[in-house]
Swiss-Prot record:
EC number: 2.3.2.27
Taxonomic path: Eukaryota, Metazoa, Chordata, Craniata, Vertebrata
Designated name of the protein: E3 ubiquitin-protein ligase MARCHF5
SMART domains, alphabetized: RINGv
Biological process annotations from GO: protein autoubiquitination; protein polyubiquitination; regulation of mitochondrial fission
Keyword terms: Endoplasmic reticulum, Membrane, Metal-binding, Mitochondrion, Mitochondrion outer membrane, Transferase, Transmembrane, Transmembrane helix, Ubl conjugation pathway, Zinc, Zinc-finger
């Protein structure tokens, strides 16, 4: 019995902190702790050293769990009992921290929704006319306005995502030899090409999302301007804007089809030249 006690006393005298590597002889007043199942040189550690190490691992989150880096045993960390006031404040702080992400998401969604409602109302007044648009919205059901107005930018964006020019271009390339008038409008559209170039994936374009968004939201303004320039004799604001939008989409689509066809032909007639460097002399 005395031998086992002497061995345990000797082990305690040989204690070494695995954080700072100090022993009992270096600091006899330090508080020691054995927080895990480790044996040997990693069994003991200073309370102050372990507290600093736990602070580094938790990084300000006092509820985070910390384990021993050697045996992976979780440290048993206890705190003094809180008073009722501090307990209520701590509970309120944790509840607020958990609720803030949901509140931020709700605020973001609400902001986007009311922005869409405002944009829809402005678009109605722009397309129909300021006075006529206000009269229409005043007579409409509020629930219909809250649902219908924010769908206006959504419909515009979805409509902008339809790449109808690509479908028209594929059909023209396929049936252009049967319609000779297309060759006069778009030169080279029906001519055979030496190779079929690889076309870029439209989803891989990082600018496409911003272009779709901006183009869709600006479209009512452009349709109104084009309608006033090309169809000034039409008295109805709505009809003039619709005609302006159709004309703009058709003209823009024709130019886009022509531009893509020329790019297609340019890639199809691409050649790789011989190297201009002199060949090495044979030894």
């Amino acid at each position: 019995m005395s031998e086992s006690n002497s061995v345990s006393v000797q082990q305690m005298l040989d204690r070494s902190c695995w954080v700072c590597f100090a022993t009992d002889e270096d600091d006899r007043t330090a508080e020691w702790v054995r927080p895990c199942r480790c044996r040997g040189s990693t069994k003991w550690v200073h309370q102050a050293c372990l507290q600093r190490w736990v602070d580094e691992k938790q990084r300000g989150n006092s509820t985070a769990r910390v384990a021993c880096p050697q045996c992976n045993a979780e440290y048993l960390i206890v705190f003094p009992n809180l008073g009722p006031v501090v307990y209520v404040l701590d509970l309120a702080d944790r509840l607020i921290s958990k609720a803030c992400p949901f509140a931020a998401a709700g605020i973001m969604v609400g902001s986007i929704y009311w922005t869409a409602v405002t944009y829809g109302a402005v678009t109605v007044m722009q397309v129909v006319g300021h006075k006529e648009g206000l009269d229409v919205m005043e007579r409409a059901d509020p629930l219909f306005l809250l649902i219908g107005l924010p769908t206006i930018p959504v419909v515009l964006i979805l409509g902008k995502m339809i790449r109808w020019e690509d479908y028209v271009l594929r059909l023209w390339r396929k049936y252009s030899n049967k319609l000779q008038i297309l060759n006069s409008i778009f030169p080279g559209i029906g001519c055979p090409v030496p190779r079929v170039p690889a076309e870029a994936n439209p989803l891989a374009d990082h600018v496409s999302a911003t272009r779709i968004l901006c183009g869709a939201l600006v479209f009512p303004t452009i349709a109104t301007i084009v309608g006033k320039l090309m169809f000034s004799t039409v008295n109805s604001n709505l009809q003039r804007t619709i005609l302006g939008g159709i004309a703009f989409v058709a003209i823009k689509g024709a130019f886009k089809v022509y531009f893509k066809q020329q790019q297609y032909l340019r890639q199809a007639h691409r050649k790789i030249l011989d190297s201009q460097e002199p060949e090495p002399e044979e030894v």
